[in-house]
């Protein structure tokens, strides 16, 4: 078994398919089974011509192959369609290959039709080839299935030996990311985020025997992301669950190839609905769709896997829940997104940023509890701001909650100083600050308090040394091609708390826009002054777009949200920089970007409803001069603000009044008199304005009253027409009722007649069934007798075939035995002759040895005789000498 020539490989090449239907949600997998060993191909897209390009191989020796060929062991290829969302596996068809067709020489591939195919209209086929190859490696076992060599991948040579199962995410707390793969090669940054947008029919998960905690149970969703436990905000109503869509994000430092390898071996993302420490239901979300898209599309845009997934109760609760239809099943809307960060690598390398440590410690950490977000909004930014935040949901119906989630996301990373807001068209709910148009905005920040008593308790904000003074302007210029089916009185609304104000900013007044018409928006220009770190504004603009809402203001009904659009503020960062001189002669930089974007509907198919043209500008005035500013808590009030006093003066106490003869007292008296005069003038102006506004209000009231009267008359006329129609319909109904009564009497008669006919036909059918049954029984008896006779013939023929096979085998064995017997006789005769020759040679040798021994014996005897005689002679000589 250890020789190379005895080891073979049965190789089944699965090349491609044809005549398959296209199913975007499914993948095709082929399982090949041979002698109890099963191999599978990689999942491929379910297209008309799927490309498998896979080889499956089994290792065995020639003796085992011969036995399998005698037994006609088949190779069965089963084709399955795998649902990427629910992981359901359904059979498409199968192919059976004959092992005897496998040859060691190369053969052309053939097309095989799928048997028992699910797609009966298409008749799908698979191109296959089966062959034998010599295995050059010594065999260890007699039979063992093994996988063919892996296909070539795009992983570089340095990572060729990297096993996907050995990849483990390592948390880098200092930089705020998870490292997957070797750090010297994996240097790209990715963001993996999971958003739970909505949930429905959750009450179906509560069995009748389950007792919920008192007095008011709280429910929440739980899942694990890269080893981090994530829960959303609890909610109490299962019938109408209301919770803000939340996004959990983790930053990953890896490469596209290594990240795909890591995702390929990860289990499905499991999301649980929990009450306390008990799981009421869960759903599994496969990451295969994300993996397939990430390998191709992630370089161009984020890849997303989203949908509504059905929650299934745990095994112990399934028996207590009744079956519900599909439309009543508990579902959860989830979106999983994987995005590659472009242009942020330089931000996270301290060597590339010549700034202080406080300015460099901005990278975000992985997941934390969402409750910490509120603390981060009140306190100065920590070295590692949180990245877990409420994000815009995937459903456009939750547009208002998108704005709130963006607001909370901004609060997670506040700017390093109190920003100023300046606007030529301020929002209705918040007046502009008096110091917003000042050329030195930082001094305006420090002089925002009303008086010295208020400034003593004002909040101090320390500006880091690396902070820059920025001015960001937004100009929503025009809107056109509004296509909603009716004229629109549109206003645009947006909010970006990072600029320092969470109040929404709106264009005013509303403008009427019709189809195929472009309108320039009034009071659409707004500017924001603030101080922050350069890389913090870059990171915020890249992560959070500006959400702009298109509203229709109707005088008679409630305001209607028509559509939304997102402005990518990061586009201004990539535009060309132009140099200009600031108000103090300093060198400043300006970046401007303009674009026309589409506004999509919030409901329905999310079609395009309008086009918006905008211009955004970012001005960098350089480093902030003032390192500590004082901001009053009432900085956004409508009262007058003293913007010229420094912070040190505001914190000092007022001096004691001097005698009346001093110039200061006279100046104060004149100032008070001037104030009273100005106050009287101001009151008169207010009264005049009030009169004008009251007249305008009266005219508007009269106009609207006339409109209401006309509308009421129109409605009365319409209702009169409807009343006539209803009376006519009532008469028709009475007529139809009488007709129905007559038809009912006729129907009863027909029913009785039909009953008689039915009974008669039933009797006739029973008689015919009895006759047919008797005929069938007789026919069955005949067929049974024929089958019995055929079975006997089959047994006889099988015995005859078996005897013939045994006779043939015996004849071959006898002939082989005779040949072996003749060879044995010849070998025996040759051995006997050789044995006789050897015996004769041994006999001669023994005779020679006996002769030599006899001669030696005789010589020894003669020697003894001579010795004896010598002794006797010696004795005689001795006697004679005596």
Swiss-Prot record:
Whether Coiled coil counts among this entry's keywords is yes
Intracellular or extracellular location(s)? Cytoplasm, Cytoskeleton, Microtubule organizing center, Centrosome
Q: Mainly resides where?
A: cytoplasm
Chain segments annotated as coiled-coil in the UniProt record: 709-882
Q: Which keywords label this protein?
A: Coiled coil, Cytoplasm, Cytoskeleton, Repeat
Q: Which InterPro entries match?
A: C2_dom, C2_domain_sf, CEP120-like, DUF3668
User: Does the keyword field hold Coiled coil?
Assistant: yes
**Annotated GO CC locations:** centrosome; cytoplasm
Reading the lineage from the top rank, the first entry is Eukaryota
Bias (Low complexity) occurs at: 423-436
Segments carrying the region annotation (Disordered) are 348-443
- Give residue ranges for domain C2: 1-112, 453-582
Return the PANTHER family for the record: CENTROSOMAL PROTEIN OF 120 KDA
Functional note: Plays a role in the microtubule-dependent coupling of the nucleus and the centrosome.
Into which family does the record put it?
Belongs to the CEP120 family.
What is the protein named? Centrosomal protein of 120 kDa
């Amino acid at each position: 078994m250890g020789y190379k020539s005895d080891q073979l490989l049965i190789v089944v090449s699965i090349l491609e398919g044809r005549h398959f239907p296209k199913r975007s949600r499914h993948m095709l997998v082929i399982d090949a089974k041979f002698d109890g060993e099963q191999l599978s191909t990689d999942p491929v897209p379910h297209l008309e011509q799927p490309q498998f390009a896979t080889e499956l191989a089994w290792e065995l020796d020639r003796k085992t192959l011969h036995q399998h060929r005698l037994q006609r062991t088949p190779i069965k290829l089963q084709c399955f369609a795998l649902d990427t969302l629910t992981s359901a596996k359904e059979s498409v068809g199968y192919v059976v290959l004959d092992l005897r067709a496998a040859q060691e020489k190369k053969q052309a591939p053939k097309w095989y039709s799928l048997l028992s195919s699910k797609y009966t209209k298409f008749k799908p086929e698979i191109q296959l080839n089966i062959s034998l190859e010599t295995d050059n490696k010594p065999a260890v076992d007699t039979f063992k299935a093994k996988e063919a060599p892996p296909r070539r991948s795009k992983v570089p040579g340095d990572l060729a030996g990297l096993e996907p199962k050995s990849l483990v995410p390592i948390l880098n707390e200092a930089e705020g990311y998870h490292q997957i793969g070797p750090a010297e090669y994996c240097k790209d940054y990715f963001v993996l985020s999971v958003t739970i947008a909505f949930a429905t029919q959750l009450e179906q998960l509560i069995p009748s025997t389950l007792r919920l905690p008192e007095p008011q149970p709280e429910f929440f969703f739980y899942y694990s992301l890269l080893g981090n436990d994530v829960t959303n905000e609890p909610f109490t109503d299962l019938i109408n669950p209301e919770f803000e869509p939340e996004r959990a994000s983790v930053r990953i430092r890896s490469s596209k190839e290594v990240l795909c390898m890591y995702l390929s071996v990860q289990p499905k993302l499991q999301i649980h609905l929990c009450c306390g420490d008990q799981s009421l239901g869960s759903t599994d979300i496969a990451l295969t769709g994300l993996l397939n898209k990430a390998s191709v599309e992630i370089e161009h845009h984020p890849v997303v896997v989203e949908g509504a997934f059905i929650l299934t109760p745990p095994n112990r609760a399934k028996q207590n829940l009744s079956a519900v239809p599909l439309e009543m099943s508990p579902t959860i809307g989830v979106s999983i997104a994987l995005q590659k960060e472009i242009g942020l690598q330089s931000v996270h390398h301290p060597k590339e940023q010549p700034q202080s440590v406080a300015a460099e410690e901005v990278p975000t950490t992985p997941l934390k509890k969402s409750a910490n977000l509120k603390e981060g909004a009140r306190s100065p930014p920590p070295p590692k701001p949180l990245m877990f935040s409420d994000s815009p949901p995937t459903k456009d119906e939750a547009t208002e909650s998108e704005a709130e989630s963006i607001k909370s996301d901004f609060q997670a990373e506040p700017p390093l100083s109190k920003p100023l807001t300046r606007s030529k068209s301020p929002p209705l709910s918040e007046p502009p600050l008096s110091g917003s148009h000042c050329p030195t905005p930082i001094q305006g920040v420090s002089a925002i308090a009303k008086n010295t008593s208020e400034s003593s308790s004002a909040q101090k904000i320390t500006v880091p040394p690396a902070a820059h003074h920025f001015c960001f302007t937004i100009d929503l210029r025009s809107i056109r091609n509004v296509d909603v089916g009716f004229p629109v009185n549109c206003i645009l609304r947006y909010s970006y708390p990072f600029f320092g104000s969470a109040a929404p900013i709106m264009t005013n007044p509303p403008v009427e826009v019709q189809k195929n018409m472009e309108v320039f928006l009034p009071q659409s220009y707004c500017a924001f002054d603030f101080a922050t770190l350069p890389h913090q504004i870059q990171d915020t603009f890249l992560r959070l777009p500006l959400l702009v809402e298109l509203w229709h203001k109707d005088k008679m009904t409630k305001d209607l949200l028509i559509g939304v659009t997102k402005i990518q503020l990061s586009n201004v960062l990539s535009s060309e920089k132009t140099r200009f001189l600031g108000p103090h002669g300093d060198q400043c930089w300006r970046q401007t970007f303009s674009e026309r974007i589409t506004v999509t509907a919030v409901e329905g198919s999310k079609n395009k409803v309008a086009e918006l043209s905008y211009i955004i500008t970012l001005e960098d005035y350089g480093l902030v001069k003032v390192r500590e500013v004082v901001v009053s808590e009432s900085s956004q009030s409508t009262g007058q603000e003293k913007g010229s006093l420094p912070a040190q003066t505001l914190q000092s106490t007022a001096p004691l009044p001097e005698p009346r003869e001093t110039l200061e007292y006279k100046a104060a008296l004149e100032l008070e008199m001037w104030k009273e005069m100005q106050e009287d003038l101001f009151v008169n102006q207010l009264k005049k304005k009030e009169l004008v506004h009251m007249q305008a209000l009266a005219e508007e009231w009269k106009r609207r009253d006339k409109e209401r009267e006309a509308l009421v008359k129109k409605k009365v006329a319409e209702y009169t027409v409807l009343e006539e129609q209803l009376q006519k319909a009532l008469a028709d109904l009475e007529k139809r009722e009488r007709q129905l009564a007559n038809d009912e009497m006729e129907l009863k008669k027909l029913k009785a007649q039909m009953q008689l006919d039915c009974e008669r036909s039933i009797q006739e059918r029973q008689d015919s069934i009895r006759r047919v049954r008797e005929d069938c029984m007789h026919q069955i008896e005949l067929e049974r007798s024929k089958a019995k006779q055929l079975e006997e013939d089959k047994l006889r023929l099988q015995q005859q075939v078996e005897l013939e096979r045994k006779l043939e085998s015996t004849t071959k064995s006898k002939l082989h035995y005779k040949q072996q017997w003749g060879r044995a006789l010849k070998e025996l005769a040759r051995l006997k002759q050789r044995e006789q020759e050897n015996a004769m040679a041994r006999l001669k040798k023994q005779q020679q040895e006996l002769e030599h021994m006899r001669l030696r014996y005789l010589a020894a005897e003669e020697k003894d005789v001579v010795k004896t005689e010598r002794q006797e002679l010696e004795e005689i000589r001795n006697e004679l000498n005596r």
